[in-house]
Amino acid sequence: MNSINANFSQNVSHPEYFFITGLSGIPYSRYFYIFLFCIYIIAVIGNSTVLLIIALDRSLHSPKYIGVFNLALADIGATNALIPNMMRMFVFESQYISYNACLANMFFVFFFSGMQCFILVALSFDRVIAICLPLRYHNIVNNTVMLLMYSAIWAFNAFVIGTLVMLITRLKLCKSNVIKSFFCDHGPVYMLASNDNIINHQLSIVVTVLYVIAPMVIVVLSYVCIFLSLSKITSWKGRFKALKTCASHMMLVGTFFLPVSGAYIAALMFSLPPNDRIISTSLSFVIPPMLNPLIYVLNTAEIKEVIRKVLYKRSALITK
């Protein structure tokens, strides 16, 4: 521990470098990092493909796919904010990160993860209007409205996370320079503070409510409204057809909120060892961005049709 704290002095407001524990001292960590890198490649390729398909095909320039485009963008940002730094620590066997780099890492991880939450809520709004008010859908939801809404979400999210990180700079991080996490997580960094800043504590609670509890409640209430509307449809065929339009979104919600909530509940209830907790939490961050493109490609007829056209054109060019 003395070597870890070599750059650390209690006479300054913060250490020059932090030491991120990551998966320290476990023999199978290399296999986990290889697995993580494979997830990263799949997530980046999958989401980049979704971005290109939506950007290049005008038939997908609709309110629903504006949301999907933003989600793919957030997924790429989230994986790039987290995994490359973890791979750097593994490949170069260097778990140190500078103070400014730590703040940047904290901002981008929370920023893009927060965007994933808010975009899922926005997509649930789209589905509620489509199912509950189908005749008014095109009057309420259009490209202009969705572009303005997503622009506001990006700006609001940047303001909240920027404020959270800015307040961290006001803390005197004099207890240690060891961050017991796999990235510069706000909670472990806050635990290093020698001065108890009530504003930081209160903002942490607000952020938890805003980014975890509120989105889950809104999504649940959205589906309550959807299922109530579906119960009024007399034919089973009509119900199934309407429910099918929500299938992709329900799977996205499940793959995002279930791993995140499961990881934190397991950590609270079962007193997981630090390394097991880090593995479960890190997987909850990276699994959804990998699965989201697969969900939309497999469940959305429009995207499958575009891919089919591209493959057909490519095969036609090859045969010529």
Where are the predicted features?
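Transmembrane helical core of 7TM receptor-like proteins
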Residues: 1-320
